Amino acid sequence: GVPVCGETCFGGTCNTPGCSCDPWPVCSRN
């Protein structure tokens, strides 16, 4: 599976460094 960052991003942004909002609405390592 995709490594997640323990964060959701319904607003479209992730606060965790090195993470992107993909697939929405879950932050994953980019």
UniProtKB/Swiss-Prot annotation:
Coiled coil: none annotated. GO terms for biological process: defense response. Pfam families: Cyclotide (PF03784). There is a cross-link at residues 1-30 (Cyclopeptide (Gly-Asn)). InterPro entries: Cyclotide, Cyclotide_moebius_CS, Cyclotide_sf. Keywords: Disulfide bond, Knottin, Plant defense. Disulfide bonds join 5-19, 9-21, 14-27. This is a cyclic peptide. Belongs to the cyclotide family. Moebius subfamily. Probably participates in a plant defense mechanism. The presence of a 'disulfide through disulfide knot' structurally defines this protein as a knottin. This is Varv peptide G.
